[in-house]
């Protein structure tokens, strides 16, 4: 890892990430441990201290292990297939929905489960959010695109609510 001012370059087995951390932070590397502290006399710039630490931590984790988000498709005919580096999803619309893969993001497709993988946590999360936004889970049956660990609160519906007929 190299640091020059607020510009950080992290290299690892998965690749290289370059990021500019918020101003007003000083990054030091001592004995292989990176520390982020607010610059002396920075005033209100110390509000970005936690953000800078998290960004640096995510860069290190990304270049060493990577990030992944698992998405599940539930619904009749809902599926996904790869079209080059991009993802084509059939979600019950007239035309398929295309999701562009950001640089460094890859897809692994198994039946109704798509795993979004990459070095940059922000890019992986952005692509996963785009997938979910294309057809969010609906509250009655739960069909749609959801995160694997997401719990969908289902509504009762007319029959379960005890609707009485007009008599």
Give residue spans per PLM region.
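Ribosome-associated RNA-binding proteins
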Residues: 1-167
